[in-house]
Amino acid sequence: MTAGKSLLRWASGIMIVLGAGHLLLLALFAWSDITGWVDRGVWAAVPLGLTAEEETVASAQNAATFWAGPGSFAVPLILLGCLTWHLARRGVAVPAWVGWSLAAWCVVGGVLLVPSPYFAGTVAGALVVLAARQGDRSAAQRERAMDPA
């Protein structure tokens, strides 16, 4: 599983860099909105908007900052990258469906938002799939070696 570990570590590194980079860029470009949340007391700083009030440019920008940051998939992508790294270190195979799902999500995102780093996420998904396939092959080879019939 050494090659599989290497593939999974590369995949997890890509996921962590994509998620952290996304949050870092948001912090750089929307710092005033983020500090505004703290100034307003954080609780319900981004209202759900179920009222009859008309949406202003400022409230739309506030909501966009939320959905581009903590409400985006950046945090779950970082967590998935950390989990993948942890599982690779322990020698536990990550299922191929995780890689296929990540790759499909990133292809759709990349097609909808061009140019974007979504396609790097497709590479991470492909690496997870390759690692799972290598793990399946090595398990089959071990079974054949144990069954001399």
Regions found by a protein language model. Name each.
Residues 91-129:
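Hydrophobic alpha-helical transmembrane segments of integral membrane proteins
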Residues 1, 139-149:
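Short, intrinsically disordered terminal tails adjacent to the first/last structured region
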Residues 47-65:
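Juxtamembrane membrane-water interface segments that cap and precede transmembrane helices
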Residues 2-12, 60-63, 67, 92-99:
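Membrane-water interface of alpha-helical transmembrane segments
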Residues 64-98:
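Mid-chain, well-packed structural core segment of small domains
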Residues 24-27, 51, 108-114, 131-142:
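Juxtamembrane membrane-interface segments at transmembrane alpha-helix termini
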